[in-house]
From Swiss-Prot:
GO terms for cellular component: ribonucleoprotein complex; ribosome. PANTHER family: MITOCHONDRIAL RIBOSOMAL PROTEIN L24. GO terms for molecular function: rRNA binding; structural constituent of ribosome. HAMAP family: Ribosomal_uL24_B. Part of the 50S ribosomal subunit. It comes from Allorhizobium ampelinum (strain ATCC BAA-846 / DSM 112012 / S4). This is Large ribosomal subunit protein uL24. GO terms for biological process: translation. Belongs to the universal ribosomal protein uL24 family. CDD domains: KOW_RPL26. Keywords: Ribonucleoprotein, Ribosomal protein, RNA-binding, rRNA-binding. The keyword Lipid biosynthesis does not apply.
Length: 102
């Protein structure tokens, strides 16, 4: 089970976007990376296709999972632990003790 999943609200711990938060769009577990909405935005040169025109577009690049932390209810970063509730393994916020999974 992964500590950070698609749809989670996360906070960036280090790098140029330190302190900013966003929602996880995609997780790449084999590379230990995630794409976060509005974080690590880079400019990409795009070639013209039948559906899209050529130009420079802004796109989110991936961030290493070690630089991300799940945001607690108050928006501050928290570590993630695991607990068994009703025979089901769930994620738990270490800071507040609340269950992250519904």
């Amino acid at each position: 089970m992964q500590k950070i999943r698609k749809g989670d609200k996360v906070v960036v711990l280090t790098g140029k976007d330190k302190g900013r938060s966003g929602e996880v769009i995609q997780v790449m577990p084999k590379e230990d990376r995630a794409v976060v909405q509005g974080i690590n935005v880079v400019k990409r040169h795009q070639r013209q296709t039948q559906t899209q025109e050529a130009g420079i577009i802004n796109k989110e690049a991936s961030v290493h999972l070690s630089n991300l932390a799940i945001a607690d209810k108050d928006g501050k970063p928290t570590r993630v632990g695991f607990s068994v509730v009703d025979g089901k393994k769930v994620r738990v916020a270490k800071r507040s003790g609340e269950v992250i999974d519904g």
